[in-house]
Design a protein with these regions (language model features):
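N-terminal secretory signal peptides and thylakoid transit peptides that target proteins
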Residues: 1-16
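C-terminal segment of N-terminal export signals and the immediately downstream linker at the start
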Residues: 22-60
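Short coil/turn motif common to extracellular beta-sandwich-like domains
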Residues: 70-76
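Short edge beta-strand/loop segments characteristic of extracellular beta-sandwich folds
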Residues: 76-82
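An anionic, turn-rich surface loop/hairpin at beta-sheet edges
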Residues: 95-120
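Extracellular Ig-like/FN3 beta-sandwich strand-entry sites
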Residues: 121-125
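Edge beta-strands of extracellular beta-sandwich domains
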Residues: 138-143
Length: 152
């Protein structure tokens, strides 16, 4: 069957319109968290993240991150927790220009688990924060970023 130019153009325009609609909706979804990931102070980031809830240090969050990072551009991190009813998991790096590194919304059916690679600007405390309905739980570890991987 021979395709006509008119049919080809109509099909191309239809797919282009659908693609543009999908692209615009993905941009709208990306904008709702943009304020959280803007440069700012550590204190302002924590205030925005906690939403007025008290913060409690706990040993029920396991923050697995190296104490010495030879390359601050690729620092592996894994967070797990035995706490129940966690709504959000967040990673905050105290000395980074943008302190909020990760914010993950968890479904109730999921185990609280997060694994990623962070970029650390300098030696800093790294916080893992688990938000529940009434309180936020946290744990922190200090990570030393070395220059050139020589330990200094």
């Amino acid at each position: 069957m021979k395709a006509s130019r008119r049919k080809f153009l109509i099909t191309t325009i239809a797919f282009s319109a659908a693609g543009i609609a999908l692209f615009k909706s993905s941009l709208a979804n990306a904008e709702w968290l943009s304020a959280d990931f803007e440069p700012g102070s550590f204190d302002a980031t924590m205030k925005q993240l906690l939403k007025g809830k008290p913060i409690v240090e706990t040993d029920k969050i396991d923050l697995n991150i190296p104490e010495i990072a030879e390359n601050g551009a690729l620092v592996p991190i894994t967070v797990t927790s035995s706490l129940k009813d966690i709504k959000n998991l967040a990673i905050v790096v105290e000395q980074n220009p943008i302190p909020l590194a990760i914010e993950a919304v968890l479904m109730p059916e999921l185990e609280p688990f997060l694994s990623a690679r962070l970029k650390l600007a300098s030696t800093s405390f790294v916080f893992a924060i688990a938000e529940t309905e009434k309180v936020c739980y946290s744990v922190k570890k200090k990570v030393k970023v070395t220059i050139g991987g020589c330990g200094g």
